[in-house]
Amino acid sequence: MKLLYIFEKNIILRKILITFSLIIIFLLGRYVPIPGVLISAYKGQDNNFATLYSTVTGGNLSQVGVFSLGIGPMMTTMILLRLFTIGKYSSGVSQKVQQFRQNVVMLVIAIIQGLAIAISFQYHNGFSLTKLLLATMILVTGAYIISWIGNLNAEYGFGGMTILVVVGMLVGQFNNIPLIFELFQDGYQLAIILFLLWTLVAMYLMITFERSEYRIPVMRTSIHNRLVDDAYMPIKVNASGGMAFMYVYTLLMFPQYIIILLRSIFPTNPDITSYNDYFSLSSIQGVVIYMILMLVLSVAFTFVNIDPTKISEAMRESGDFIPNYRPGKETQSYLSKICYLFGTFSGFFMAFLGGVPLLFALGNDNLRTVSSMTGIFMMITGMSFMILDEFQVIRIRKQYTSVFENEEN
């Protein structure tokens, strides 16, 4: 009874235990085999980017399992829905309708991705349409289960869907340790050392920019003491965080799923395969597009996380204002310029730090997996701060009690 009382009263302990339990379920599901499919017989294993993408989105293609799709379908759905609702307000749409739309789009995306992966499986006693459809259905179901686990964690635990992605990426990087040692022994000592040093520098800069902020002076009408001169609006230098990396991989990988399906339908058409170079990190075109997308998404996520429109409206309603800028459109325009400035800055530095190793490894299949390490660990660093910030908010909130709370409790 005492343990149950502690579990009920200690919100931090309760959230940690719930998150830990959900992570265990998530990790176990990654290794639950699909009936009729040969484990570790994914015919697309030579596609290092597909395996990397599955790791980034919490999936696992290095060993075929129920959760091989990860949260990829949900991420693609979020991108598509956001693209089609740019400039539109969804406040008039009920939560139920929004959820229905999201589930329908996610189902279509999951079926496309599931079919593309299931086609690349090797099956016991040969291929059949029944086995293909069964494997696809299981993969789609697994994607929805992961989405459900992430939503449970967001409501009752720490980190939401983010912590599942971080855990999946860490497990994937641990699996790459033997490859690093093997390359080190095969004469790639200098390249490995340079990659590791570059990754450490990138992580240090990521931490520095993540904790740096630009302070905009704000006149608070509700403050009538000496603190009025110290009031400011903090704008993070890297407001996009590490999310841009994950969504870049999503945008690059989804067209590859389409190409896989088209290639299976039209196996004699060589033009279909040629389009793959534009979305693969093993080609110069793919790396350049990767860096461009990184810049664009960094700016986009900066606007999403800061939202100048909402901030300017909230300031106008409260009576607060930025010196030398009129409330409303003028304030919104000023904040938008700040977002463009820092979004472009963070986009350039992340594209440069994540793209240079990929350019260096072009033409060398042995170094391709190691070269992606920089972007992965920058992503882990950015997402870890998101989780730590959530933990900090709960810890601070726990220090304050309700005015009406009985002192004996």
UniProtKB/Swiss-Prot annotation:
GO biological process, one term: intracellular protein transmembrane transport
Location of this chain's protein in the cell: Cell membrane
Transmembrane segments: 16-36, 61-81, 104-124, 132-152, 161-181, 190-210, 242-262, 286-306, 341-361, 374-394
Pfam families attached to this UniProt entry: SecY
Gene Ontology annotations for the cellular component aspect, listed alphabetically: plasma membrane
Record keywords: Cell membrane, Membrane, Protein transport, Translocation, Transmembrane, Transmembrane helix, Transport
Family matches, as InterPro entries: SecY/SEC61-alpha, SecY2, SecY_dom_sf
Its membrane topology: Multi-pass membrane protein
Claim: Cell membrane is one of the keywords in the record: yes
UniProt record similarity statement: Belongs to the SecY/SEC61-alpha family. SecY2 subfamily.
Quaternary structure, from the entry: Component of the accessory SecA2/SecY2 protein translocase complex required to export cell wall proteins. May form heterotrimers with SecE and SecG subunits.
Record's function text: Part of the accessory SecA2/SecY2 system specifically required for export of possible cell wall proteins. The central subunit of a protein translocation channel.
NCBIfam families: acc_sec_Y2, PRK12417.1
Descriptive protein name: Accessory Sec system protein translocase subunit SecY2
Organism in which the protein naturally occurs: Streptococcus agalactiae serotype Ia (strain ATCC 27591 / A909 / CDC SS700)
Lineage: Bacteria, Bacillati, Bacillota, Bacilli, Lactobacillales
Gene assigned in the entry: secY2
